[in-house]
Swiss-Prot record:
It is found in: Membrane. Its main location: membrane. Residues 376-742 are cytoplasmic. Residues 1-25 form the signal peptide. This is Probable LRR receptor-like serine/threonine-protein kinase At2g02780. InterPro entries: Kinase-like_dom_sf, Leu-rich_rpt, Leu-rich_rpt_typical-subtyp, LRR_dom_sf, PRK1-6/SRF4-like, Prot_kinase_dom, Ser-Thr/Tyr_kinase_cat_dom. Coiled coil: none annotated. It comes from Arabidopsis thaliana (Mouse-ear cress). Pfam families: LRR_8 (PF13855), PK_Tyr_Ser-Thr (PF07714).
Amino acid sequence: MQISLQIHLSSFTFLLLIFLLPVLSESQVASSESQTLLEIQKQLQYPQVLQSWTDTTNFCHIRPSPSLRIICLHGHVTELTVTGNRTSKLSGSFHKLFTLLTQLSSLKTLSLTSLGISGSLSPKIITKLSPSLESLNLSSNFISGKIPEEIVSLKNLKSLVLRDNMFWGFVSDDLRGLSNLQELDLGGNKLGPEVPSLPSKLTTVSLKNNSFRSKIPEQIKKLNNLQSLDLSSNEFTGSIPEFLFSIPSLQILSLDQNLLSGSLPNSSCTSSKIITLDVSHNLLTGKLPSCYSSKSFSNQTVLFSFNCLSLIGTPNAKYQRPLSFCQNQASKAIAVEPIPKAKDKDSARIKLGLVILIIIGVIILAAILVLLVLIALKRRRSRSEDDPFEVNNSNNERHASDKVSVCSTTTASSKSLPDSRRVPQTMRSAVIGLPPYRVFSLEELEEATNDFDAASLFCEQLYRGCLREGIPVTVRVIKLKQKSLPQSLAQQMEVLSKLRHMHLVSVLGHSIASNQDHNQHAGHTIFIVQEYISSGSLRDFLTNCRKKEVLKWPQRMAIAIGVARGIQFLHMGVAPGIFGNNLKIENIMLDETLTVKISGYTIPLPSKVGEERPQAKKPRSNEDREKEDVYQFGVILLQIITGKVVAAGSSEMGSLKLQLENGLRDEPSVLSSLADPSVKGSYAYESLRTTVEFAINCLCEDQSKRPSIEDVVWNLQYTIQVQQGWRPSSGNHESSMKAIYE
C-alpha cells in the first residue's frame, strides 16, 4: 500500500513539473540573456531608469512603465524598450552595445531612445540582429554616419524609427526589400538629397527636417495605404503634384517649409479624407482653390501662410509675402536642383564631360581675371607717381527719426529692416530636453500627484507632481461640461500635442478619464501634463531687488522677444490659432537660463464645468482676440522697460504710458530717466527709444492701429540689432546680446 502511494506521488510530481516548466521558463529569462541585459546597463552608463538592475533581478517580472518594458517568452527577451531623458552625448564607444544587442536572438521589439547613444551603425551588426525583429526605434540619440544598406535584411521589420539623430547622406537606394514596413520615421537628420525607393505597405512616412533636394517623387502615388506623409523642413522643389491628393487613405499631408512653387492644385479639393494639409512657408503663388472657403470643408485644416498667394481682401492677406519674392526664390531653387544620379555608363560619361568642361571654363576665366588685375595694377602704379595717396571717404548715414508717430501701424518699419522681413523666423523651434509627447495612464498621474492630494494643489485645478522618471511636472485638471465624441476628443488632443515650443510651458502629454475610469469626476475629465518651471516668474524678478539686478537691458530684450515668439507660435504655429491668452507678467516664467516660458495660455478644449458664456454678448472674433494679446504684450513691455508693476487698463498704467509718450518728444535724458535704474549703462539709447515707441503702439486704444504679432517680432529684432552695434563705456554687453539674438 505504501509503495503504491509513493508511485502515485512520484507520478503526480512528474506531471506537475511538466505543466509548470513552460510557466517557469516564461517567467525567468535565460541566464545568458540576464548577463547580456546587465552588460547593456553598463554600456548605457547606468541611466536612471535602469539603476535598480542587479544580479538578482528577475527581468521578466519588471513592472512595465512608459520608460521601461521587457517582455519574455519561453525564457527569451522578445521586447526591450528603454526611454531615457539624456539631452547630451555620452562619452565612449557604443560598438560593444550594438554587439550585445545581437545576443538577444528572439527580439521582436527594440526601442532605445533618448539615451545619449553615439557612433555609427555597423553593417555587420545590422545583419546579426534578431531576424524576427519587427520594430526598431533608436530615436533622439546621437548616432551618425550613413544608414547601412544592410537594413533591408530585416525582412520582418514593420516599424523603423531613427528620427532626431545625426545620420547623413544617401539612404539605401531601395528600401523596398522591407516589404512588411508600415512606419518609417527618419525625421530630424541630414539625409538626402534624394528620396529612396519606398516599400508599398507604408502607412506613415516622416522625412521632415532633413536635406532632401529634389521634386516630390512619383513613387509616392503607389503607396495606397499611406495615411500620414510629412516632408516638411526640407528643400523639395517644383510644384505640388496632383497625385498626392488621389492617395485613397491619406489624412495628414505636411509639405511646409520647403521650396515648392506654382499653385495649390484644384484636385486638393477632391480628397475628402485629408484632415490636415500644411503648405505654409513655401513659394506658392496664384489663388487658393475656392473649395477652402466652402462650409463643406470646415472640418479640414489647411495652413498656407508665408507664401505669395493672392488673398487680397481677406484677413489672411497679411500673412503672405510679395509675389516677386517667391518668383526670385523659385528661380534660385530651380538653379540649385541636384543632377540625378547616373543610371548607366553613358550618363556617367556625360556627367564627367560636363565636369571637365566646367573646370576648363573656370581656369580660363581665372586666367582672364588675373590678366585684368595685372593691367589695373600697372595703370595704378603709373598714376601713383603723380598722386601717391588715393583716399576714398565714405560717410555713414544714420537713420533716425526726430518725430514720434504715436499709434502708427509700424515702428522701425520694414524700410529699416528689408532683409529681416524676407524670411520670417521659424515658429517651430526644437524643444531640446523634452521627453516625447505621450498619453499617460490615470494611475501614473495619481502616483505623480499623491492621488491629487490637496498638498499638491498650488493653483486652481493645477497640481504639482513628479513622474516616475524624476521629471517635475504640473497636472491641470479640466472637467468638461458634457461627454465629447471620441473623434472630436482625438482631434483636440492632436492640437494639444502640438503645444510644444521653446517659449511655452510645453505640454508633455495628457490623460482622459470618463465616469467609469474615475469616479471622482463626472463625464469626461482631461488631465494635461505640462513642464514645471521652478525659477519664478517675470513678476518675481521685477519685484525682487537682487533678481532685478540680473535683468540688464540685453536680458530684458531677450525676454521681450521670447514672449513675442511664444505668442507668435500660439497665433500662427498651430491650427487653428490660439488667441485670447492670459498674458501677464505673473504668467511669464523664466527658467535657470532666463529663457521665457509662457504659462496660463488658452487650452483649446470644449466648454468646461463652471464656464458660462453670456448669451447676450456677441462672441469676439479671432482678430479682436489677437489684438487683445498684442495689447497685453504692450503692458508687459511697459513693465520690462520701467521695472514698475502695473495692471492692464489701470490709471497707473495710463499715467506711465503718458510719461513715456512725453519722454519720446523731449530730450533723451528725460526718456532715459523713465527707464528702470537697474538697466543704467547697459543700453543704447536708440534701442530704448524704439522699444518704448513700439510698446506705445501696442497699447493703442484703436485696436486696428495696433501692430500684428509678426510686426512685434520683426521690430524687436530691429532693437536688438541696434543694441548689437552699440559698445558700452563700461562692461561688455555685446557678447551677451549676440548670444541672445542667435
